[in-house]
């Protein structure tokens, strides 16, 4: 490492030495500050959460280059299209391409690939030249005027998922920031939303506060939080939904369900369900709430609430994702592939379909079994962040750290607090069932939408898809009886604070490793 940075002295890459030193200082300050806050009892956990997750996410956001996260370019395009609408400008050209500033064409048609005929996305391939390009471009001054287009097409989803990033892009355009400044400001707004909703989750949930904190410190979660990915929005909203339901279910019997609670759940249904349909399954957790909490004559009120929330879920999904619904229930199982054959014909791929699954009722279970046998270890690794970027094997979290992340998270999930409400056996069974059902729906949806009929395991499933409902499974094993283990105290820091501090330290080591990997790639 020392030899590498010595080679930068006196060259155009000398700025990387300062960046690396600044990165180390920032990480040390963040970790030291959070450990000090843990020792001060007057600081609430949700306040420490916001500071820790926002600051760590900010460092991840600035270190991992723009548009390097999984599918980030598609979500950036969606946010840019919404920004066009906010500014009252044409969203697309006559050919259906999203309009962007000429300045921002640099991001989607990066000249650093030295191929004028190839539209390479900045951050698609990570090497030293990406940092050099960002340094040369700067943050604050756009150098080009006029408009251009991007060939990238946005993801079809609710505009709510891109509202904050689009606000960041709009502000950057009004301030005439450079392309790099624009893309970072949009990322910043998405991170701000994630940290805010996460802090609200930790404050609201009656159990598992440290668990939500720990999952938010996974390298994968921090990378997504500081990117344009709508997974950041989904994870944050899912966490808050789980916290709201647990609060309503486990609060004291005298705390009934009010109109405000129903409105809150209805708003969450509108915000979350159309973004990624499968996560609407989380609303089944509402059945944890005792019917008696609806007050006198509860059943009519309960039924009305269920019908209202259910109608909002179904209606919002059909309004936003009608074509996707048809795609998942596709009877023919034939889809157009994006490439052409050598003869110029459009290639078609036969996918698994519902008729096939209905005819052979054990097929889906055999395929899921094969998938878990082949990719189960990868799911566990990529949930934490085994590979960052676009599954870049060089931007990796080492195996010992993956084990420690999982071990720390499991301990924080299982070891409860004496004063917190306990989950009953029916509660635990239902939470376990909802987790299995959501996992099953996830697998089946990817089987029907992406998996060729001649493939015996499911394609397209990634570990990050499990993050929004991972707390449901882990909280089902909560054991307040083990609260004595929290009495373990090291250097004046509590058990949970010690584990969270270790996770932050591992995040720092992972990020430093990623930076060194990228700068070594000439």
Segments the model singles out, each with a brief description of its role:
Residues 40-43, 294-303, 411-436:
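Membrane-interface helix-loop-helix junctions at transmembrane boundaries of multi-pass membrane enzymes
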Residues 32-36, 181-208:
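Transmembrane-helix motifs of polytopic, lipid-linked glycan transferases
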Residues 223, 260-277, 282-288:
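Membrane-interface alpha helices of multi-pass inner-membrane proteins
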Residues 43-47, 177-180, 199-219:
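Transmembrane-helix signature of polytopic, membrane-embedded enzymes
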Residues 86-185:
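Interfacial juxtamembrane loops and adjacent helix segments
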């Amino acid at each position: 490492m020392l030899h590498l940075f010595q080679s930068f002295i006196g060259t155009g890459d000398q700025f990387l030495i300062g960046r690396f030193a600044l990165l180390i200082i920032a990480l040390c300050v963040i970790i030291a500050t959070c450990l000090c806050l843990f020792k001060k009892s007057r600081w609430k956990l949700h306040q420490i959460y916001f500071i820790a997750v926002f600051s760590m996410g900010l460092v991840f956001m600035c270190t991992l280059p723009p548009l390097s996260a999984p599918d980030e370019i598609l979500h950036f395009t969606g946010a840019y299209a919404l920004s066009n609408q906010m500014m009252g400008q044409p969203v697309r050209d006559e050919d259906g391409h999203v309009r962007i500033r000429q300045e921002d064409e640099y991001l989607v048609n990066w000249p650093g690939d030295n191929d004028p005929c190839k539209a390479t996305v900045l951050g698609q391939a990570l090497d030293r030249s990406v940092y050099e390009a960002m340094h040369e471009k700067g943050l604050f001054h756009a150098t080009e005027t006029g408009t251009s287009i991007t060939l990238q097409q946005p993801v079809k989803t609710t505009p709510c998922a891109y509202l904050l990033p689009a606000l960041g892009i709009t502000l950057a355009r009004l301030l005439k920031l450079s392309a790099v400044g624009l893309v970072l400001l949009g990322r910043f707004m998405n991170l701000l939303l994630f940290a805010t909703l996460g802090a609200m989750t930790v404050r609201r949930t009656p159990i598992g506060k440290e668990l939500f904190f720990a999952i938010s410190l996974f390298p994968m979660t921090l990378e997504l939080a500081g990117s344009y990915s709508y997974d950041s929005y989904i994870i944050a909203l899912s966490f808050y939904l789980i916290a709201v339901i647990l609060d309503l279910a486990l609060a004291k019997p005298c705390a009934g369900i009010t109109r405000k609670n129903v409105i809150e759940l209805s708003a969450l249904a509108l915000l979350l369900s159309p973004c990624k349909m499968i996560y609407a399954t989380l609303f089944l957790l509402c059945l944890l709430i005792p019917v008696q909490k609806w007050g006198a004559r509860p059943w009519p009120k309960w039924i009305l609430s269920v019908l209202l929330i259910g109608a909002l879920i179904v209606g919002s999904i059909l309004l936003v994702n009608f074509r996707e619904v048809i795609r998942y229930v596709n009877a023919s199982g034939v889809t157009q592939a994006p490439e052409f054959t050598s003869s110029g014909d459009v290639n078609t791929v036969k996918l698994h379909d519902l008729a096939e699954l209905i005819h052979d009722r054990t097929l889906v279970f055999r395929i899921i079994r094969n998938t878990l046998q082949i990719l189960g270890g990868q799911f566990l690794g990529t949930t934490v962040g085994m590979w960052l970027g676009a599954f870049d094997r060089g931007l990796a979290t080492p195996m010992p750290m993956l084990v420690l992340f999982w071990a720390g998270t499991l301990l924080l999930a299982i070891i409860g607090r004496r004063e917190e409400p306990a989950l009953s056996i029916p509660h635990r069974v239902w939470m376990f069932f909802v987790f299995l059902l959501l996992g099953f729906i996830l697998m089946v949806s990817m089987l029907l939408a992406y998996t060729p009929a001649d493939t015996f395991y499911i394609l397209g499933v990634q570990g990050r898809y499990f993050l929004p409902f991972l707390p449901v499974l882990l909280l089902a094993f909560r054991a307040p009886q083990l609260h004595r283990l929290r009495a373990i105290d090291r250097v004046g820091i509590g058990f949970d604070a010690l584990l969270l501090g270790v996770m932050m330290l591992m995040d720092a080591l992972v990020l430093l490793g990623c930076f060194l990997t990228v700068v070594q790639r000439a």
